[in-house]
């Protein structure tokens, strides 16, 4: 069933344009509150946000919805997404909300929802919310004496800092490391530098002056050039780039090279396997992760469990197969020993632990495998189903035959934008580029004909 509101990571869109309007945010609060107010106890919700301007508007709208449904609201202020997941459990809340559009520009915003266990909601529960949003919910409002209250609990972000610090092995400190960190002018602008400094590092910061409109603006994990420049400028041992809500991370080594999530997962999997910490004999990663990662793990008798795109599907696979490491090439790294969702700061701390223990440079630690050439292009579509066209299906079959066992082909609709993503990878870059270009032309031709 096609859903109207929820995508692969909650509800997302441009602020003040459907579905990211204050009216819908209030209705989401009522709908979610209706579903999660089971039991006789006083129900509560925690709400965090990143630093984008529209966060104030949406936060207040959701407070109105939740309190109207009879839930008390704890407002955390700017805090990383994993902090919301952690505090949802710690504060015994019935629901957790993160208001963020992650790595998107300030004009966008989104609503991510966590259950009382700190995990993102299942597709079934999201469908129940969608069903309620299509109904008249006036009958679901609380009695006057049962309306909820709201209060700010800004100090609870320090509980998240302490939780993150505890994930660094006790025999490791960060003394002697010069770390440049880019917080994307986002949710981690206070907590991440504080945690690194308290663990003993010399910390150089960029992207820590949010003004409501500069989140992810030429900074953060999607724009690492600023951090690469800073690493060179201050001769840092390592650069850490977070995104707007700090649930993803990329690393810049001492030479200025960017290290993506695939390489980071390889480092953590290798280290944890050697220490007897890795569970399930492998890791979970999405279909977008490089074939080089899969080959690297296979050579070490570890299995790569592939999932659909989206960290929520990575987490589902991890829970199903008993894995404790998973993630995405984009830098979502999920370490279930420490949390229930991607956590950029915690993942970075695990890399720093390996660097300190082995006494090697970041470039020596993090370049674990040579990525297989990978080409990704997008085709914009406004209507129709071009992937069902006979000519497109024939072109896909021919491309798969060309790649055979030497590569991979992935064609999928985007979960957040009106795009079809065409990705191929293989040992022969020229062949991969030709295949992607041919498929883009065929899909684009069908789109235009429609």
UniProtKB/Swiss-Prot annotation:
Listed A to Z, the keywords are: Isomerase, Magnesium, Metal-binding, Phosphoprotein
- Location of the active site: 102 (phosphoserine intermediate)
- Report whether Protease shows up as a keyword of the record: no
Q: What is its EC number?
A: 5.4.2.10
How the cofactor is bound: the record states:
Binds 1 Mg(2+) ion per subunit.
Q: How is it modified after translation?
A: Activated by phosphorylation.
Q: Which cofactor does it need?
A: Mg(2+)
Q: Which GO terms describe its cellular component?
A: cytosol
BP-aspect Gene Ontology terms = carbohydrate metabolic process; peptidoglycan biosynthetic process; UDP-N-acetylglucosamine biosynthetic process
Tree of life domain: Bacteria
Molecular function (GO) terms for this protein are: magnesium ion binding; phosphoglucosamine mutase activity; phosphomannomutase activity
Q: Positions modified as Phosphoserine?
A: 102
Q: Which residues bind Mg(2+)?
A: 102, 243, 245, 247
Cross-referenced InterPro entries, in alphabetical order? A-D-PHexomutase_a/b/a-I (IPR005844), A-D-PHexomutase_a/b/a-I/II/III (IPR016055), A-D-PHexomutase_a/b/a-II (IPR005845), A-D-PHexomutase_a/b/a-III (IPR005846), A-D-PHexomutase_C (IPR005843), A-D-PHexomutase_C_sf (IPR036900), Alpha-D-phosphohexomutase_SF (IPR005841), GlmM_bact (IPR006352)
Q: What class of enzyme is it?
A: isomerase
* Catalytic activity of the protein: alpha-D-glucosamine 1-phosphate = D-glucosamine 6-phosphate
Matching Pfam families: PGM_PMM_I, PGM_PMM_II, PGM_PMM_III, PGM_PMM_IV
Write out the similarity annotation.
Belongs to the phosphohexose mutase family.
Q: What does this protein do?
A: Catalyzes the conversion of glucosamine-6-phosphate to glucosamine-1-phosphate.
The protein's name in its UniProt record: Phosphoglucosamine mutase
Can you name the source organism?
Rhizobium meliloti (strain 1021)
């Amino acid at each position: 069933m096609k859903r109207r509101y929820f995508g692969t990571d909650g509800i997302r869109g441009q602020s003040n344009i459907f579905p990211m309007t204050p009216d819908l945010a209030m209705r989401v609060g009522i709908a979610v509150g209706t579903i999660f107010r089971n039991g006789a106890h006083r129900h509560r919700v925690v709400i965090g946000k990143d630093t984008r301007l529209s966060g104030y508007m949406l936060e207040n709208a959701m407070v109105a919805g939740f309190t109207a449904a009879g839930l008390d609201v704890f407002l955390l202020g700017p805090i990383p997404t994993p902090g919301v997941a952690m505090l949802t459990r710690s504060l015994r809340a019935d629901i957790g909300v993160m208001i963020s559009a992650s790595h998107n520009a300030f004009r966008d915003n989104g609503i991510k929802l966590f259950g009382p266990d700190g995990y993102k909601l299942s597709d079934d529960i999201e469908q129940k919310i969608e069903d309620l949003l299509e109904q008249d919910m006036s009958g679901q409002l609380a009695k006057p004496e049962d309306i909820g209250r709201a209060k700010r609990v800004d100090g609870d972000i320090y509980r998240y800092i302490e939780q993150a610090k505890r994930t660094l092995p006790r025999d490791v400190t960060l003394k002697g490391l010069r770390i440049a960190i880019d917080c994307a002018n986002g949710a981690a602008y206070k907590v991440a530098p504080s945690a690194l400094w308290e663990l003993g590092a010399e910390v150089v910061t960029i992207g820590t002056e949010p003004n409501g409109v500069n989140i992810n603006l030429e900074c953060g994990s999607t724009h690492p050039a600023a951090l690469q420049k800073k690493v060179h400028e201050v001769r840092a041992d390592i650069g850490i780039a977070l995104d707007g809500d700090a649930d993803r991370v990329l690393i810049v080594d001492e030479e200025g090279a960017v290290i993506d999530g695939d390489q980071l997962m390889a480092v953590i999997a290798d280290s944890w396997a050697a220490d007897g910490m890795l569970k399930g004999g492998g890791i979970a990663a999405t279909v977008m992760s490089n074939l080089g990662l899969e080959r690297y793990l296979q050579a070490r008798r570890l299995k790569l469990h592939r999932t659909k795109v989206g960290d929520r599907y990575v987490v589902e696979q991890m829970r199903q197969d008993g894995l404790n490491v998973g993630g995405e090439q984009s830098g979502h790294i999920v370490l279930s020993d420490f949390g229930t969702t991607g956590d950029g700061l915690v993942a970075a701390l695990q890399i720093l632990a390996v660097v300190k223990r082995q006494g090697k440079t970041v470039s020596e630690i993090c370049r674990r495998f040579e990525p297989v050439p990978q080409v990704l292009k997008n085709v914009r579509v406004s209507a129709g189903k071009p992937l069902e066209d006979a000519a497109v299906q024939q072109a896909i079959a021919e491309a798969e035959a060309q790649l055979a066992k030497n590569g991979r082909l992935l064609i999928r609709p985007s979960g957040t934008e009106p795009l079809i993503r065409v990705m191929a990878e293989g040992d022969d870059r020229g062949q991969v580029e030709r295949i992607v270009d041919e498929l883009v032309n065929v899909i684009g031709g069908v789109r235009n004909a429609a």
